Amino acid sequence: MDILLANPRGFCAGVDRAISIVESALEKFGAPIYVRHEVVHNRYVVNKLKEAGAVFVEELDEVPDDSIVIFSAHGVAKTVREMAKSRALKVFDATCPLVTKVHMEVHRASRKGSEAVLIGHAGHPEVIGTMGQYENREGGMYLVETPDDVARLKVKNPDDLCFVTQTTLSVDETSDVIDALRKQFPKIQGPRKDDICYATQNRQDAVREMAGLVDVMLVVGSRNSSNSNRLRELAEKVGSKAYLIDDASMIETVWLEGVKAIGVTAGASAPDVLVQNVIARLRELGGNMVVEHPGREENVVFEVPPELRII
């Protein structure tokens, strides 16, 4: 059984930055450091940071006065920032810069009074944060997930409307919804550049290229990771059996029966150590040659805040 590794896979620049912010804050200020929501959606990463002294909370009222709090990579609503400011909490913002770009687009629409549509999954932290950038009561902010949602959408002024997308969705998902929006609202304006992030796009492209070469695709990532779920769905859509696993212990031998080639990739919030453990386990189960599939090289780096840079 050959093992094919997707390239690129695993950590993106936004995740790397978010984790570095928490680690640097712990190193500089000591524990506890409070983090609003899981800094990234990966159980292994979160548990490691907990062991180092990070305390994960869902709301700021769980954070004691005079504490340091970090906002997760998914971003937060304006009301959360305002609450942190009113309590004089020391804040470090680990919001991915690509999510911040979407926030700025929504803020501009709100300021102008244009209505805005967000393509995203209800309840996802990034979606909650992005929806929370719109404050204009005279306008409107709407969430859609499918073309059917678009068909039911009623807006106040279809001539002054824009859309943005959740960064971790699949390109296939958003294209259908965008087509529906443009058909129903011919004057709708989109972002100057696609909101789907480079890492999401690259990892999806790698899976799309590999899926036809393997019998089974393993996606390393947590179940609450949006981009990891999209990778599994994409592999299945292209025609490969696919499984989302937190780690090597979740591999079931029945998946490998009759398999000549197996693919391995990882969501943008999954560390490489988990991938290496999966490879080791596959070798124990009969895997031999490990081949890294050619893909797009990534050299994007997002800097941590100056105050947290360790010299």
Swiss-Prot record:
GO biological processes: dimethylallyl diphosphate biosynthetic process; isopentenyl diphosphate biosynthetic process, methylerythritol 4-phosphate pathway; terpenoid biosynthetic process
Annotated catalysed reactions: isopentenyl diphosphate + 2 oxidized [2Fe-2S]-[ferredoxin] + H2O = (2E)-4-hydroxy-3-methylbut-2-enyl diphosphate + 2 reduced [2Fe-2S]-[ferredoxin] + 2 H(+); dimethylallyl diphosphate + 2 oxidized [2Fe-2S]-[ferredoxin] + H2O = (2E)-4-hydroxy-3-methylbut-2-enyl diphosphate + 2 reduced [2Fe-2S]-[ferredoxin] + 2 H(+)
Positions bound to (2E)-4-hydroxy-3-methylbut-2-enyl diphosphate: 41, 74, 124, 167, 225-227, 269
Positions contributing to [4Fe-4S] cluster binding: 12, 96, 197
InterPro entries: LytB/IspH
GO MF terms, alphabetically ordered: 4 iron, 4 sulfur cluster binding; 4-hydroxy-3-methylbut-2-enyl diphosphate reductase activity; metal ion binding
Metabolic or biological pathway: Isoprenoid biosynthesis; dimethylallyl diphosphate biosynthesis; dimethylallyl diphosphate from (2E)-4-hydroxy-3-methylbutenyl diphosphate: step 1/1; Isoprenoid biosynthesis; isopentenyl diphosphate biosynthesis via DXP pathway; isopentenyl diphosphate from 1-deoxy-D-xylulose 5-phosphate: step 6/6
Binding site residues for dimethylallyl diphosphate: 41, 74, 124, 225-227, 269
Residues that coordinate or bind isopentenyl diphosphate: 41, 74, 124, 225-227, 269
Enzyme Commission code(s) on record: 1.17.7.4
Cofactor: [4Fe-4S] cluster
A Pfam match: LYTB
Record-annotated active site: 126 (proton donor)
Superkingdom of the organism of origin: Bacteria
UniProt record similarity statement: Belongs to the IspH family.
Protein function: Catalyzes the conversion of 1-hydroxy-2-methyl-2-(E)-butenyl 4-diphosphate (HMBPP) into a mixture of isopentenyl diphosphate (IPP) and dimethylallyl diphosphate (DMAPP). Acts in the terminal step of the DOXP/MEP pathway for isoprenoid precursor biosynthesis.
Name of protein: 4-hydroxy-3-methylbut-2-enyl diphosphate reductase
Organism: Aeromonas salmonicida (strain A449)
